[in-house]
């Protein structure tokens, strides 16, 4: 049995907390919202996972120290925009040598750091966290399916494979198959940037385009992500694997995907703000666009789909005309790097 602290009580955090508790682990969940802690404790329900019953064994707390101290694993499951502030708050209670697992997906716009890098950057400021182990968990994983115990696969990525395997051992069960990977950077880049491509897929569906276009966006979108990722030092296998192509497929095609759904609404004529409001949950693809653009510029990588999404989502470009412009770009070989 492992002792696990979960920071964040959203759909993903609670789906994983339930799964881990049902596997026999001791789970403590913290939320920054006191009223959310009270509601979860009282109802044993997560409002966005209406069919899921929260096990009585899961403990909820309003004190972040209680979720961080004396834990085998601390799980960061908060929206990307809050990762740094929560890491800063938690730092005083996280011991050196701790295993930290991040399941949020994103890139910090101001620093262009991945989220495990953001946590490390914050913890390293006091000079007391030089031996913390950082693991990125990512893959084709809708919280709604994990909450229903449907078969799911995910990647545990850490340079230290002994740590990656320890996390694999804790998270793996008959419904969750966990693979290890040593390419934490590549896995995190896939998780963040695929959300932008999923927006593109949704926009095209909203415009009434078909499966041909969606397939093209998935393949060419991953080509863009891979071009950037390889220049940044990621490993090619990561982009072709579960955290790369696997996650992109599910995010760009599923009706459960917030990014796909937000894109669909934008394709139907809604503004980005209207789409986010209607989806009702964080749309990480919109948050990831500025960092994606900066990284493309910094590493001199051509990412036309990402730039097209930015034009439609943030600059008021006509979606149909933007697709036409993509289709009429200069002729190229598919093998162009």
UniProtKB/Swiss-Prot annotation:
Family: Belongs to the NAD-dependent glycerol-3-phosphate dehydrogenase family.
SUPFAM superfamilies documented for this protein: 6-phosphogluconate dehydrogenase C-terminal domain-like, NAD(P)-binding Rossmann-fold domains
Record protein name field: Glycerol-3-phosphate dehydrogenase [NAD(P)+] 2
Keywords, ordered alphabetically: Cytoplasm, Lipid biosynthesis, Lipid metabolism, NAD, NADP, Nucleotide-binding, Oxidoreductase, Phospholipid biosynthesis, Phospholipid metabolism
GO biological-process terms attached to the record: carbohydrate metabolic process; glycerol-3-phosphate biosynthetic process; glycerol-3-phosphate catabolic process; glycerophospholipid metabolic process; phospholipid biosynthetic process
GO cellular component: cytosol
Signal peptide: none
Domain of life: Bacteria
InterPro entries for this protein: 6-PGluconate_DH-like_C_sf (IPR008927), 6PGD_dom2 (IPR013328), G3P_DH_NAD-dep (IPR006168), G3P_DH_NAD-dep_C (IPR006109), G3P_DH_NAD-dep_N (IPR011128), NAD(P)-bd_dom_sf (IPR036291)
GO molecular function: glycerol-3-phosphate dehydrogenase [NAD(P)+] activity; NAD binding
Top enzyme class: oxidoreductase
Job description of the protein: Catalyzes the reduction of the glycolytic intermediate dihydroxyacetone phosphate (DHAP) to sn-glycerol 3-phosphate (G3P), the key precursor for phospholipid synthesis.
Enzyme Commission number(s) of this protein: 1.1.1.94
Gene3D superfamilies listed in its UniProt record: N-(1-d-carboxylethyl)-l-norvaline Dehydrogenase, domain 2, NAD(P)-binding Rossmann-like Domain
Pathway participation: Membrane lipid metabolism; glycerophospholipid metabolism
